[in-house]
């Protein structure tokens, strides 16, 4: 979902270089220096307005989190949440999910989150889906052996597509939830969209898969 252009968004990001990594290519292989520790790194591709990545960072101070989104205005709203939280273990990148190998070394990322990604429902747009095989190729390069992807969506079509895509790629489906909010799963941190969908009673699907 597109967010209305936010005035001053670019300046907002540029004025906060501690949290927004403006030259991420230079951080490749050096993320431990960026964070000042060697804690595990988890990334969220398509981080939206930052509720999930900020919530996770506050909940798990022993893990470093990186929120990634290509939309300028969206990332500026995520920065608002990061600044308000003052979480020391979160950073933001404005880059495309298809280019992650430009910013992370092999095995440098320990876990990935894909939350409420654009479903791109038309067949001609299949290659844009973040669970398409070319994206999985990219993710595999930056994750360690048995690296994990945690995926959430309200879109049944995208969920079924992703189940098939992960399986066809040879990934292992560790756990699958067909109605996350009706399950006994503990520790769920919601995105902005998820909270909105939950109020409407929409079903949320979730899975965990490993390479």
UniProtKB/Swiss-Prot annotation:
Residue spans crossing the bilayer: none
Reactions mediated catalytically: guanosine(46) in tRNA + S-adenosyl-L-methionine = N(7)-methylguanosine(46) in tRNA + S-adenosyl-L-homocysteine
Keyword Metal-binding: no
EC number: 2.1.1.33
Keyword Ribosomal protein attached: no
Residue positions of the active site: 118
SUPFAM superfamilies on file: S-adenosyl-L-methionine-dependent methyltransferases (SSF53335)
GO CC terms in record: tRNA methyltransferase complex
HAMAP family in alphabetical order: tRNA_methyltr_TrmB (MF_01057)
Family: Belongs to the class I-like SAM-binding methyltransferase superfamily. TrmB family.
Protein known as: tRNA (guanine-N(7)-)-methyltransferase
């Amino acid at each position: 979902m597109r967010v209305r252009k936010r005035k001053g968004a670019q300046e907002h990001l540029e004025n906060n270089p501690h949290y927004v990594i403006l030259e991420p290519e230079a951080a490749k292989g050096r993320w431990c220096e960026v964070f000042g520790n060697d804690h595990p790194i988890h990334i969220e591709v398509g981080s939206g307005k930052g509720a999930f990545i900020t919530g996770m960072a506050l909940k798990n101070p022993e893990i470093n989190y990186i929120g990634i989104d290509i939309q300028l205005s969206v990332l500026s709203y995520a920065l608002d949440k990061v600044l308000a939280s003052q979480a020391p273990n979160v950073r933001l990148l404005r880059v495309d999910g298809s280019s992650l190998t430009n910013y992370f070394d092999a095995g440098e990322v320990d876990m990935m989150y894909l939350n409420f990604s654009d479903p791109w429902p038309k067949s001609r747009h299949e290659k844009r889906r973040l669970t398409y095989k070319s994206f999985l190729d990219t993710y595999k390069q930056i994750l360690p052996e048995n690296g994990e992807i945690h995926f959430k969506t309200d879109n049944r079509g995208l969920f079924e597509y992703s189940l098939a895509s992960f399986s066809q790629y040879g990934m292992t489906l560790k756990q699958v939830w067909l109605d996350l909010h009706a399950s006994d799963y503990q520790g769920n941190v919601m995105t902005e969209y998820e909270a909105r969908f939950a109020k409407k009673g929409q079903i949320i699907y979730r899975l965990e898969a490993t390479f």
